[in-house]
């Protein structure tokens, strides 16, 4: 443990892992006040910037890769502070949307503003649509009840499961989740709502998503955090219809590489899955979403014999939906072109899809109750097609669960990422 003294106006940047205890004085952390006796835990691959309000002293314990830097200025740009004053002049309730590339400090900026408005007595909320940060694969709503030091360390007020750490291929789910979280914010009387968006900003699909989000949210102000007008392609179409405010990136922003980002996602999933147990459902006990499976009729009798004759073996599980025929095995079994042609002749309007237990096992899922509320994460550990049983590793109690929403990320039960699979792979 070492003692670090900091004067009013100076900033101490602490890279984790580290433990900080305020020994004396008053400070701020992203706009949140911290005082004598307060403790801050900084995890590996994260950092905090503690700014002295008065002359202060901190007791800091550093881990193996932790370190401390002292700056004689604030890491919060003056323009950010001025924006808070500008937004405070808006009629409440208001919505502010934030655009920015990765590593521009959007989330830090949003957290700072949320803390300031909370301390100004406003009912304050944050909607995070950044699927790769915080809670992986979720769109989250936070209603502030105290100032926030790190949104990843508090429980969301509500959440929507997308099931991917990127919005690419999941734009519709992002839109739906964002709309639901905004409606929830309205229902609880949020006066100042800040919407943090993903750093996906290049390419026509990113353009389309950002355009759709603006049209959906209809913000009172669009805040663009950029270095050198690199987001001009996104905002120029809105200059005549939306109030756009350009903000600089903090010069002290720290870059995170892919390894750091992956580590933080895995750490979050590991934390969320801790204390889990396995639960098993019969297919008939629960609804499946984002999957063809369990949405049709299980084949038996003459039709089953016909399908077995075409594929030249007896499948473990065959399900016919209005738009697809599913054949399930324990292991992936590709069909020959000859067999596919026979299927097309026999069922000209129904494509065939081969699915396997291998594809489904280790898929990250969202568990939902009867009111369509997200309850928590789960990981598929086993699926038995013959018995129509699915087993999930989760901290959520079985009695609460009404439906399973399948994601496109495969992870181990302790949260380590394995691979990404295409949506509707099974």
Q: Where are the regions that the model predicts?
A:
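Preference for solvent-exposed, low-hydrophobicity sequence contexts
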Residues: 1-94, 98, 112, 165, ...
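The conserved Walker
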Residues: 102
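Conserved lysine of the Walker
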Residues: 106
